[in-house]
Design a protein with these regions (language model features):
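Iron-sulfur cluster-binding electron-transfer modules in prokaryotic oxidoreductases
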Residues: 72, 95, 99, 113-124, ...
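N-terminal leader/transition segments
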Residues: 1-123, 134
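An acidic, phosphate/nucleotide-engaging active-site surface
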Residues: 138-204
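Ferredoxin-type iron-sulfur electron-transfer modules in oxidoreductases and energy-metabolism complexes
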Residues: 286-320, 335-446, 453, 554-560, ...
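Catalytic cores of enzyme domains
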Residues: 181-352
């Protein structure tokens, strides 16, 4: 990305922050809080998710067979099935149906897939008036705007903005102001349009292969009207929407509303097995049928391929097809909460999962426009009702985008980037710089303190911003001349009569910059009679993986496995300070290493305070640690630490040691490794961080602590003072 492209991206994000950010943030965060509250009521949330995942895996595996089954079922019911290869094929068929009916108006409800194939434009070209009947979609149609959210397409619009739009466009007798007035006006107008329509079009949340039943999960009743009022019903759905049977709908019905909007159950759950023989009712007098049920009703199920079968054959993108379009990944994403789908989205789809959809359907160029907004924080994986590894899909797509990227000004980092990404193509300069952070850290440490002066000097700041897009408003952490490993090698272990020995993993931040927290970690473990070894081990590969440099991350993972394997094989435990590295050991290494190497390392690696909690639970003396004496602490846990389920260990240990702990509940601090250092994303990063900053200021605690390097850097910029890592509070004085 050139300097000019970075500036355009930054300007676009700033505009959305100013014009849509408040509305998007308020709504998505509300949905996200609702999800937490709603799923907490379930007896077996994880079991439901696993069941739903299993059904989708089976359905996608048997997809050709299920397409045949649903075709037979619909035809037995008297309907027609058409499997469209692509958008043009689907639109041609739908246009033919409209022509056969001599249709002047088609009304639509609940069909994102129809947005994907751009059927509105194609029918408009043929003289068919297409009317969206879902309120949010209709608002956007009137405003001529694109959706900004999978479930709530007009989430970026305020009530005041919608009132202004309606008053200007429709000039009602009395100006519309309240939400009740707006919805009443829309209901009446849409009712008239639906009643006079020739064709009704819906999508489907699910299609059952056994009976040809459509499952529609909606918050409004217009989908039912769209099905029953016109004589012709066209349902448009991707082939991935097929599940084997009606019985398979149960876990999805339990999960979809809770995951998407925080509702225990949505307003309408419709199971339709068309053609519908029920008589059309009058909207003004719903008790009186307009027809006797003997009308010439017909039904067409248009199943869309449009790249999906190729995605099914792609081992990395296949998981995208498990998506049930609930929007949980969007609502849980801190970046999406700030800018919405007009930035974090492509031609049709938005949010974390959109990268997979857009790459598979539209191509890498479209996915590249927003892929970097996924920082890999992993909060979406916990939110997803079918356990899709969304960050991995984004990483894979980023790697594929990199492979087609021309490397600009590579000579500037030649020799500083010993990665495995190949020559003549690969990640751009900015990604390559951050992906090879460990090499830069080694050099910075070797030449400290001169390197610190140079890195934070005004000329260097301007050069790095101009050439590599490193925002000069960020200050680099200071490199330390004596590394943690060097300090420990000279000092040796100081545990008295140790009961066990562990390997303390020297991540690049702790080893080369945040050496004091590493020393505190050593003292903390030794105080609990644990001897510490700090071996020569490279970085985990988190830095290159975050930039989509999978080959480099894989090579690094192998080196780490070779270095730590002997300790693990001898029964040793690996203790990790930086949560993002532990997430690599327990998560991404499963994709980068053979199972025989991944499993032992994953099973024997621990976050440091998690490990301390285990020691205390098994009889270690908490009195050996620092006494908080009732001091108040505001604690922010790292995003990946939360996804791993480890945040509570830190809270518990701090409280056991006498600290009065308040925790934050934001999904991510906004720094996300290198993300907040990048010029084009600085403003977004700080906007995300302000939510955290507000919570920390409101806590008014004596101390602020945070578990990750990114978090401490961001909080330092937000509050003007660097927080401590929990080990620095817990460790006895050295």
């Amino acid at each position: 990305m050139s300097s000019g492209s970075r500036e355009r991206t930054a300007a676009h994000l700033r505009e959305l922050l100013e014009t849509e950010g408040d509305a998007v943030a308020g709504n998505t965060r509300g949905f996200n809080r609702g999800r937490y509250d709603s799923v907490a009521k379930l007896d077996d949330y994880d079991g439901l998710k696993a069941e739903a995942r299993g059904i989708k895996e089976d359905a996608i595996e048997r997809l050709p067979e299920l397409i045949e089954s649903v075709t037979g079922a619909v035809e037995d019911n008297g309907g027609t099935v058409y499997v469209a290869d692509d958008a043009a094929d689907a639109n041609a068929y739908i246009a033919e149906v409209c022509a056969d009916r001599d249709a002047d108006r088609l009304v639509k409800s609940k069909s994102m897939t129809s947005e994907e194939i751009e059927v509105n434009d194609r029918l408009d070209e043929r003289g068919v008036d297409v009317v969206e009947t879902d309120l949010g979609e209709w608002v956007l149609q009137v405003a001529d705007e694109a959706p900004s959210h999978i479930v709530a397409p007009a989430i970026h619009k305020s009530r005041e903005g919608i009132a202004e739009l309606f008053n200007e466009r429709f000039d009602p007798d009395e100006p519309l102001e309240t939400a009740e007035e707006l919805t009443a006006f829309a209901r009446d107008r849409l009712g008239e349009l639906i009643e006079g329509a020739d064709v009704g079009m819906t999508g489907a949340n699910f299609v059952t292969a056994d009976s040809g039943t459509l499952a529609l999960v909606t918050s409004e009743g217009n989908a039912r009207k769209t099905v029953t009022a016109p004589d012709t019903h066209v349902a448009v759905a991707g082939v991935e929407k097929i599940v084997p049977s009606v019985e398979d709908l149960q876990p999805f019905i339990e999960l979809i509303g809770r995951s998407g909007t925080g509702q225990d159950i949505t307003s309408y759950i419709s199971l339709l097995t068309p053609p519908m023989n029920s008589p059309t009712v009058g909207f003004d007098d719903p008790e009186t049928p307009i027809t006797d049920g003997e009308t010439d009703r017909d039904f067409h199920l248009v199943l869309i391929d449009n790249g999906r079968m190729a995605m099914r054959d792609d081992d990395e993108l296949r998981e995208t097809l498990y998506c049930i379009r609930c929007s949980a990944c969007s609502n849980a994403c801190a970046n999406f909460q700030s800018v919405g789908g007009h930035a974090f989205g492509g031609e049709t789809y938005s949010g974390g999962i959109a990268t997979g959809w857009e790459a598979g359907i539209e191509g890498l160029d479209t996915a590249a426009e927003f892929n970097d907004l996924c920082t890999g924080c992993s909060r979406c994986t916990e939110a997803c009702p079918v356990n899709i590894d969304i960050p991995w899909i984004n990483t894979v797509v980023r790697d594929r985008i990199n492979s087609g990227t021309d490397v600009n000004a590579e000579f500037l980092v030649d020799g500083l980037t010993p990665d495995a990404e190949g020559d003549g193509g690969g990640p751009g300069l900015q990604k390559r710089l951050f992906g090879n952070f460990e090499t830069l850290a080694k050099l910075g440490s070797a030449f400290a303190p001169v390197s610190n002066w140079v890195a934070n000097s005004t000329p260097a700041g301007y050069l790095l911003e101009r050439v590599a897009g490193v925002d000069r408003r960020r200050e680099f952490p200071a490199f330390r001349r004596t590394t943690l490993r060097e300090w420990h090698a000279e000092r040796g272990s100081d545990a008295d009569d140790p009961e066990r020995e562990v390997v303390l993993y020297p991540d690049p931040y702790t080893n080369y910059m945040l050496v004091d927290r590493g020393k505190a970690a050593v003292r903390l473990l030794e105080a609990l009679d644990v001897a510490v070894t700090i071996p020569d081990v490279p970085g985990s590969g988190r830095a290159p993986l975050s930039q989509g440099m999978i080959d480099t991350a894989t090579a690094t993972a192998r080196e780490v496995s070779e270095a730590l394997g002997p300790y693990v094989d001898d029964g040793g435990d690996v203790v990790v300070i930086e949560p993002s590295d532990l997430a690599m050991f327990r998560g991404e290494y499963e994709r980068l290493l053979p199972g025989s190497e991944f499993e032992p390392l994953a099973e024997n690696s621990y976050e440091i305070v998690e490990y301390v909690y285990g020691l205390l639970a098994n009889g270690a003396d908490a009195d050996a640690l620092s006494d908080g004496g009732g001091e108040s602490v505001a604690y922010h846990s790292h995003c990946q630490q939360r996804t791993l389920g480890l945040a509570e260990y830190t809270r518990a240990v701090l409280e056991e040691c006498g600290y009065d702990v308040t925790t934050t509940d934001v999904e991510c601090c906004g720094m996300a490794g290198s993300f907040g250092y990048k010029r084009q994303y600085y403003d977004l990063s700080m906007d995300v961080g302000e939510n955290l900053g507000d919570q920390l200021r409101a806590a008014d605690a004596d101390r602020v602590v945070a578990s990750g390097t990114s978090c401490t850097d961001q909080i330092g910029d937000l509050l003007g003072a660097d927080p401590l890592h929990p080990v620095e509070l817990l460790a006895p004085e050295g």
